[in-house]
Amino acid sequence: MVTLLENPFRTGLRQERTPEPLILTIFGASGDLTQRKLVPAIYQMKRERRLPPELTVVGFARRDWSHDHFREQMRKGIEEFSTGIGSEDLWNEFAQGLFYCSGNMDDPESYLKLKNFLGELDEKRNTRGNRVFYLAVSPNFFPPGIKQLGAAGMLSDPVKSRIVIEKPFGRDLSSAQSLNRVVQSVCKENQVYRIDHYLGKETVQNLMVFRFANAIFEPLWNRQFVDHVQITVAETVGVEERAGYYESAGALRDMVQNHLMQLFCLTAMDPPNAIDADSIRNEKVKVLQATRLADINNLENAGIRGQYKAGWMGGKPVPGYREEPGVDPSSTTPTFAALKLMVDNWRWQGVPFYLRTGKRMPKKVSEIAIQFRQVPLLIFQSVAHQANPNVLSLRIQPNEGISLRFEAKMPGSELRTRTVDMDFSYGSSFGVAAADAYHRLLLDCMLGDQTLFTRADEVEEAWRVVTPVLSAWDAPSDPLSMPLYEAGTWEPAEAEWLINKDGRRWRRL
């Protein structure tokens, strides 16, 4: 299947922007992210003729690999995790721009070695001094890596040098502020691309178009018509091989502070003055500044955690979180988190936003659901079917699309109603598959477009919102007090209470 960017019917309709020749250096190049996501996305852009022929990719990691071995590993990744190599001629052309440099993240000599190597490649490949440095490494390597890049003078050009930082950006408000200070000590904000791959998903990007390009919806997008909003990111997988990271992170750090808060911002923000990076990010910061936990004095009314226990997934038994390899048998790390947020502004005053995420849930699904208020007078009370409130749901994954639920009369002589859905699907409407999120984000970074990347103050405001719950959950607690939910179910009973006490209920997806 072709992707949106290679749709043959679009050829010649408009000129696609192509980045300037540059060198993309990936730190942590021997890791899964590089092989599974980054290089396959770059190769797909090459297939779509979106990249200059001079584009050069340099892998940087501790392993003592040769250029050829790095190329072999990246080819395996493209064949296994993407659409395949396609033309051998195209692959050979692409491989000529793949290089490898071994070194340590905290070793100054490694950076001088890298700097000299990039200088040689710059002359050989004619990349004109343009550099992108991608930190696809463990978060504890962010500060030393950024400092060493600065000390080596590789971030000194505010126009030609950029740095991409993967999530998580800090583990709390204090560490995020500290990391921002490190970044700001060596480069300017316009050089920094804090990446959240959820912002590269088509449905997420379409949310602003849906809201601000259609007169029918935005007038209803407020407290007058909206009863509440639910944002769900559910995963079927367990902790898998990430126990070392997950034990120190948990669901709130891993998913809520970044992915769910970004979805929240795009749902709740006011219209920007223009579709550019600063205008959009200004509005996201404004709505975060107006956001608070529903009950700061009684956190049980604002946040619920949980942890999966042994259960069944796809007809097979799976272990509980505490039984996973590498996990403390008495761990109180949450694998489920639910928050109730309130926004103190004219648009949303009194409208609750319910956020939830968890591992080992029945389905892998991400959705934003806006539930509208019930009609003021139910004139069809004599009808056997009880009228349901209208719900607008935006499906981020799987099957990207939008659905509107409403009431309709059933065929026949009697007045009977039924709840029906009006659906929009990307696949069926455009006849193309949505491009991978990293595809769009990498291209935007190469083009110097920061619209889909988070700004320093935005990151800090998101941490501020969740900090009270985070502090409470980080405090030592009795393992027996941790709410549990069976693998293959939606959430612990306590999370049901969080929304049921308001006369509402979680959507069953």
From Swiss-Prot:
It is an enzyme of class 1 (oxidoreductase). Keywords: Carbohydrate metabolism, Glucose metabolism, NADP, Oxidoreductase. It comes from the Bacteria. NADP(+) binds at residues 62, 167. One of its GO terms (biological process) is glucose metabolic process. Substrate binds at residues 197, 201, 235, 254, 359, 364. GO terms for cellular component: cytosol. The active site is at 259 (proton acceptor). PROSITE patterns: G6P_DEHYDROGENASE. InterPro entries: G6P_DH (IPR001282), G6P_DH_AS (IPR019796), G6P_DH_C (IPR022675), G6P_DH_NAD-bd (IPR022674), NAD(P)-bd_dom_sf (IPR036291). GO terms for molecular function: glucose-6-phosphate dehydrogenase activity; NADP binding. Pathway: Carbohydrate degradation; pentose phosphate pathway; D-ribulose 5-phosphate from D-glucose 6-phosphate (oxidative stage): step 1/3. It catalyses: D-glucose 6-phosphate + NADP(+) = 6-phospho-D-glucono-1,5-lactone + NADPH + H(+). The keyword GTP-binding does not apply. The keyword NADP applies. It holds the Pfam family G6PD_N. Its EC number is 1.1.1.49. NCBIfam families: PRK12853.1-3, zwf. Catalyzes the oxidation of glucose 6-phosphate to 6-phosphogluconolactone. Belongs to the glucose-6-phosphate dehydrogenase family. This is Glucose-6-phosphate 1-dehydrogenase.
